[in-house]
Design a protein with these regions (language model features):
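Alpha/beta-hydrolase active-site loop
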Residues: 82-104
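N-terminal cap/lid segment of alpha/beta-hydrolase-fold proteins
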Residues: 1-25
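The serine-hydrolase catalytic nucleophile loop
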Residues: 39-51, 230-231
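Conserved loop-alpha-helix segment in the C-terminal half of the alpha/beta-hydrolase fold
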Residues: 223-245, 250-251
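Active-site nucleophile loop of the alpha/beta-hydrolase fold
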Residues: 136-146
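Catalytic histidine-centered segment of alpha/beta-hydrolase-like enzymes
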Residues: 251-262
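Short beta-strand/loop motif that positions the catalytic acidic residue
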Residues: 213, 219-221
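Conserved alpha/beta-hydrolase
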Residues: 51-77
Length: 282
């Protein structure tokens, strides 16, 4: 496997950083695009542990940062970036930039693989790109009213004070302070007023988008995760394409200690979808 750090231009001054993984001898199957979860990045979680397995199957892989990576970060100045500033629309744009970068290298439409918020955004991308050959959802969240109802119950972001903090964010935006940071008691702890309100109001529903998905899908969820928050079965029932659901035992949202099982499930499923049995047997 060969690995190269890459930079992908966007429509702002902030590019997307990532890693491009190629099999020894080059890709023989196609490409995969791996999308990280909220406040994560391309060198942790699935974007890190999946490429070695996928390149063995013949896939080239792009693991990349969205502009909303980590919680807060800075690169070559004191200007900061990260998930505290992210919007749903920006995340969707970033997938378009990343996929276009892959196809500019001569590849056909990539397999889309996304963890958590990366999976949520992946569903929206694939709904607009029916040429996508396959999609893997790793605990893709429900979108829709998730931030409004589920996250407060789980104590995330503003928790039970969501309505109160939403009004505060709306007032800040009305007063021209939309880019100022708000502090919250729950993960991910800080967000601008604009980003926080965006999170509460702009996310499409993953399940309601399912009828627009025509490619085969693998949807994985850990058994310690909420079915409402990560609605694999409901998505499968509504998808226009086939959708296989796998519930992993003794598994939480970040797959700690269960990475090998995730790798096995994803690899075996891709082998079946792309008729790669001869590669797996070697």
């Amino acid at each position: 496997m060969h690995t190269k750090l890459v930079t992908i231009e966007t429509n702002t001054d902030q590019p997307l950083d990532g890693a491009w993984y190629e099999p020894d001898g080059g890709s023989t199957v196609g490409a995969a695009m791996i999308c990280h979860g909220n406040t994560m990045n391309f060198y942790v979680g699935a974007p890190r542990f999946l490429p070695p397995a996928l390149t063995k199957l013949g896939f080239a892989c792009l693991s990349f940062n969205r502009r909303g990576h980590d919680v807060l970060s800075n690169r070559n100045s004191r200007s900061v970036e990260g998930a505290a500033f992210q919007t749903t629309a920006e995340g969707m744009e970033d997938n378009e930039f990343a996929a276009a970068w892959i196809m500019d290298k001569g590849y056909k439409a990539p397999v889309i693989i996304g963890h958590s918020n990366g999976g949520f955004l992946g569903v929206q991308y694939v709904s607009q790109h029916p040429e996508t050959p396959a999609m893997v959802l790793l605990s893709a969240h429900a979108g829709g009213t998730l931030a409004k109802h589920e996250l407060p119950r789980d104590g995330l972001l503003a928790g039970p004070k969501t309505l109160e903090r939403r009004k505060e964010a709306e007032a800040m935006i009305a007063n021209g302070r939309g880019d100022e940071i708000m502090v919250f008691p729950g993960w991910w702890y800080v967000a601008t007023a604009r980003s926080y309100l965006d999170r509460l109001t702009t996310m499409p529903s993953t399940v309601e988008t399912a009828p627009k998905i025509f490619c085969p899908t693998l949807y994985i969820r850990g058994d310690q995760e909420s079915r409402n928050g990560y609605p694999a079965e409901d998505f499968s029932a509504k998808s226009s394409g086939s959708c296989d659901v796998e519930i992993v035992a003794n598994c939480e949202h970040y797959y700690n200690g269960r990475q090998d099982e995730i790798i096995k499930l994803v690899s075996n499923w891709l082998v079946r979808q792309f008729n790669l049995e001869s590669i797996l047997n070697h």
